[in-house]
Amino acid sequence: MVRTIAFYNVENLFDTIDQEDTLDEDYTKDGRNHYTSNDYKMKISGLSEVIAKIGSKRTANGPDLIGLSEIENAQVLFDLVDQPALDSLSLGIIHKNSPDRRGIDVALLYRQAVFFPLEYDNVEVQLWDKKGNRIYTRDVLWVHGIMDAEELHILVNHWPSRRGGSSESSHRRMKAAWVNKKIISRISQSQPEAKILIMGDFNDDPVDDSIKVGLSSKSKGQLNPGDFFNPMEKMYNMGWNTMVYRDQVHLFDQILLSRPLLKTTDNSGFKFMKAGIYNPEILIAQEGKYKGYPLRSFQNGKYSKGYSDHYPVYVQISKSR
């Protein structure tokens, strides 16, 4: 039995309604991106077709769990799972609003026939600037559930950006890593051998301190209790990427696995099988400034009929029936 667990930054999945409490004016008909209802319908249809095919070379059903970032609200999630391309997955939604000043959240979609949520919560990442003013960013979404009679914990992230410079902003992402470790510590008190997956757009690469030190990312042969294996590090070292930022390619989108998902002594439970970046030709820009990079949704002040400025990533785990 093989299950696919994915993560996708869907690049500003906003509806076209101007909400008073969020900075969403750019994503309206009269806003900077001249974003219409037809644009929204096209974007959400395209995203649904992409999601349905993630990991499909190995399984016929599409992904079983899908973490998302840059979604505006619950309504866009309902619209997304209601698309014909996702009908067969019968996806449930886990989402809570974050205090992010842009109005974007993280969420988890799950196949209701496969995954049963037990509990979930948002955990704040509290940040302040040099003047002591609060910086509002995305919460970490923690989900605890059962898949094929086995407990899993999923942490969905979208860490603070590199705005202001990578080094200057690195402490913010390290704080987000610390929040993850705090959640993991709490889980481990009652479940020392918990199977945990940390996923997200980390705005850092697999070799950066927030991942290597903050999340205790190690290679397979060096894992101690509390450490995590990051299959995306090898991909990064091979030159693979999921997005471009300021003319530099990066692999910000990652999924890490706790040590119990790497053990080979117990054949009865889920084990890591493989990881990948889903980037078929349809998701790659064929011309223009971003040729060879993800076919983004918005360019030059308009919807450009693309999908996202990130590629989705996934891991596959397997177990004996």
Question: What do the PLM-derived regions correspond to, one by one?
Answer:
Residues 186-196, 203-321:
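Metal-dependent phosphoester-hydrolase catalytic domains
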Residues 4-12, 32, 119, 151-161:
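Active-site-proximal beta-strand elements of phosphoester/diester hydrolases
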Residues 1-86, 94-100, 104-106, 283-291, ...:
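N-terminal, active-site-proximal structural segment of metallo-dependent hydrolase catalytic domains
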Residues 21-24, 28, 148-172:
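Active-site His/acidic residue clusters
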Residues 5-10, 40-43, 47, 54-77, ...:
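Active-site beta-strand/loop signature of hydrolases that rely on acidic residues for catalysis
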Residues 65, 71-151, 159:
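Structured beta-strand-rich core segments of catalytic domains in phosphoester-bond hydrolases
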Residues 75-78, 102-103, 163-166, 205-210, ...:
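Extracytoplasmic/secreted cell-surface and envelope-processing proteins
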Residues 34-45, 68-74, 135, 167-175, ...:
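Soluble non-cytosolic domains of exported or imported proteins
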